[in-house]
Regions:
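Glycine/small-residue-rich loop that forms an oxyanion/phosphate-binding "nest" at active or ligand-binding sites
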Residues: 57-59, 73, 81-83, 102
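Metal-dependent catalytic neighborhoods of phosphoester/phosphodiester hydrolases
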Residues: 65-73, 88-92
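Pre-active-site segment of Zn-dependent metallo-hydrolases
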Residues: 16-55, 59, 66-71
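Beta-strand-turn-beta hairpins that frame and shape the catalytic cleft
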Residues: 1-2, 14-20, 109-119
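Bacterial Sec-exported substrate-binding components of ABC uptake systems
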Residues: 1-9
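Active-site environment of divalent metal-dependent phosphoester hydrolases
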Residues: 12, 28-29, 59-64, 86-89, ...
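Metallo-beta-lactamase
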Residues: 82-120
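A short helix->loop->beta-strand "cap" motif at the edges of active sites that frequently abuts
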Residues: 18, 74-78, 98
Length: 120
């Protein structure tokens, strides 16, 4: 397993069973008063965004970067959804072109393709 920090709360996790990108954030948020430090805009997002799975923890703009998700993250990625009581996160991601979702349950282990086990 290899974990690559990609700025703020973002990371890419690579395993023999697949790859997961978590909370990718690059563009300024909150009226451009928040921005990633150090600057992560020059990372190879074409490669980093080509993943099997995407995990966005919540809709705060320093975790959910719609512009970046639209431009760089593979729409073939399966989105790992937390067990939230509303569909707002899924709705926002569907609006960006993501189509494949795995709805997780809290405190439950989920086995993904290739045998990768996760718990959200």
């Amino acid at each position: 397993m290899r974990i690559t920090g990609t700025g703020h709360a973002s990371m890419r996790i690579d395993t023999g069973a697949g790859s997961i990108l978590c909370d990718p954030w690059v563009n300024p948020a909150f009226f451009a008063s928040w921005f990633p430090f150090p600057d992560n805009s020059l990372l190879d997002w074409e490669t980093l965004g080509d993943v099997d799975y995407l995990y966005v923890s919540h809709l705060h703009r320093d975790h959910f970067d719609a512009q970046h998700l639209t431009r760089f993250i593979s729409k073939k990625a399966t989105v790992l959804l937390p067990a939230y009581p509303t569909s707002q996160l899924e709705d926002e991601l569907r609006d960006l072109g993501f189509k494949d979702f795995l709805r997780t349950k809290s405190d439950e282990v989920h086995e993904l393709d290739g045998g990768l086990k996760i718990m959200i």
